[in-house]
Amino acid sequence: MPVLLKMSVSITFLRPFARVLVPFTLHRKRRVLYSTIMQRYMSSKIPAASYPNKESTPPSEELELDRWKITMKSSVQEEDVSTATSSEDEDPLAATRELVEMWRLLGKEVPEHFSEEELKTLMECVSKSSKRKYLKYLYIKEKMKKARQIKKEMKKAEKEEPKKDQLPETIKEDKQQNFLFLRLWDRNMDIAMGWKGAQAMQFGQPLVFDMAYDDHMKPKELQNAVSQLLESEGCNRRNVDPFHIYFCNLKTGGAYYKELVKRYGEKWNKLLLTATEKSHVDLFPKDSIIYLTADSPNVMTTFKHDKIYIVGSFVDKNMQPGTSLAKAKRLKLATECLPLDKYLQWDTGTKNLTLDQMMRILLCLKNTGSWEEALKFVPSRKHAGYLEISQHSQEFLNRMKKSKTFNSFPRGSINRHRKSSLKENI
């Protein structure tokens, strides 16, 4: 008895603490009331989803549920087929344009204008992230182009303002004045350069650009190569004695052809040059061809006016050395490279030059024959200056002493050469 009394006393003492800590220890009526209050509170905040018990559902309800699932699946399949047929009938270019317009309305970085080729390139992108990156690239490119245009217009306006201030008032009022020198209009300059280009096509020395490297370049590198070709053609057109330019291995409908037609536009058919799908081997004899490549072991000493020089239209940013040299060897052609180490203190880096730099060097060699003048078109960031001329004269004397023709020179000619080289150094 005393043990039972002690246990009852302890239970009555601990009961209020248990009610506070654990609500489930309440009486049955209070527990039911607590649960109903919680259900009403939760139902007002979040709609509760009730899942039927599979064991309690009768078989008739299970059959109706299965029928509903079958009908829903069939309707979804019909919708997929209809959307697939509609997507096939719809133009993919129009769908891509709609996607771009939707992204523009959402405030994403999308260009305002883009060409058909850029749209086709966007269609070839597989994932959404690649499409987004490509559109961002076009957006940044368009913004940079607009910024350059604005900067160019501002510079032009700044240059024109002081010129207007320097002109007298009589000239400002009436532009038709008599001057000492005849004014050359742009139309007259175009006619003069056209005559020179026509003469070069008939009597000029050929210069061939090998266009068979479009498979070795990425689209961005090919665009860079076309920009260099445009610069080369303009430099040749403005020269006193231009080359007769050949674009050999130019496939009609190829990447090079499309980009050139896109850049030139209507002027492409009016250019005074020869564009052909034939190879340079089919047009000229192999004995008169010299392929210029930086990988050649043969160093170019002088410019030969009776030879036909070939320049590979290849922008190599992926470091593919020996590509043009291998092609020249495969065709059994003579190769040469520019004497950069002989005249320049070359620093680290490749000796590949751009197409417009090669054009300027060859034009200068053709007109002057001076390597010192021609190699001024090599970028100064690639070398540390010219070598001393006395070093070349000493090398020349050493070669002449070793050769058999040293004794055939008249007396005093070697000394005169030394004195002249010393005077040049002074």
From Swiss-Prot:
One of its GO terms (biological process) is mitochondrial tRNA methylation. One of its GO terms (molecular function) is tRNA (guanosine(9)-N1)-methyltransferase activity. PANTHER family: TRNA (GUANINE-9-) METHYLTRANSFERASE (PTHR13563), TRNA METHYLTRANSFERASE 10 HOMOLOG C (PTHR13563:SF5). Keywords: Coiled coil, Methyltransferase, Mitochondrion, Mitochondrion nucleoid, Phosphoprotein, S-adenosyl-L-methionine, Transferase, Transit peptide, tRNA processing. The keyword Coiled coil applies. It is found in: Mitochondrion matrix, Mitochondrion nucleoid. Mitochondrial tRNA N(1)-methyltransferase involved in mitochondrial tRNA maturation. Component of mitochondrial ribonuclease P, a complex composed of TRMT10C/MRPP1, HSD17B10/MRPP2 and PRORP/MRPP3, which cleaves tRNA molecules in their 5'-ends. Together with HSD17B10/MRPP2, forms a subcomplex of the mitochondrial ribonuclease P, named MRPP1-MRPP2 subcomplex, which displays functions that are independent of the ribonuclease P activity. InterPro entries: MT_TRM10-typ, MT_TRM10-typ_sf, Trm10_C_MTase_dom, tRNA_m1G_MeTrfase_euk, tRNA_MeTrfase_TRMD/TRM10. Its main location: mitochondrion. Belongs to the class IV-like SAM-binding methyltransferase superfamily. TRM10 family. It catalyses: adenosine(9) in tRNA + S-adenosyl-L-methionine = N(1)-methyladenosine(9) in tRNA + S-adenosyl-L-homocysteine + H(+); guanosine(9) in tRNA + S-adenosyl-L-methionine = N(1)-methylguanosine(9) in tRNA + S-adenosyl-L-homocysteine + H(+); an adenosine in mRNA + S-adenosyl-L-methionine = an N(1)-methyladenosine in mRNA + S-adenosyl-L-homocysteine + H(+). The modification Phosphoserine is found at S86. Residues 138-166 form a coiled coil. GO terms for cellular component: mitochondrial nucleoid; mitochondrial ribonuclease P complex; mitochondrion; nucleoplasm; nucleus; tRNA methyltransferase complex. PROSITE patterns: SAM_MT_TRM10. Residues 1-41 form a transit peptide. Component of mitochondrial ribonuclease P, a complex composed of TRMT10C/MRPP1, HSD17B10/MRPP2 and PRORP/MRPP3. Interacts with HSD17B10/MRPP2; forming the MRPP1-MRPP2 subcomplex of the mitochondrial ribonuclease P complex. Interacts with GRSF1. Its EC number is 2.1.1.-, 2.1.1.218, 2.1.1.221. It comes from Bos taurus. This is tRNA methyltransferase 10 homolog C. It holds the Pfam family tRNA_m1G_MT. The gene is TRMT10C. Residues 193-385 form the SAM-dependent MTase TRM10-type domain.
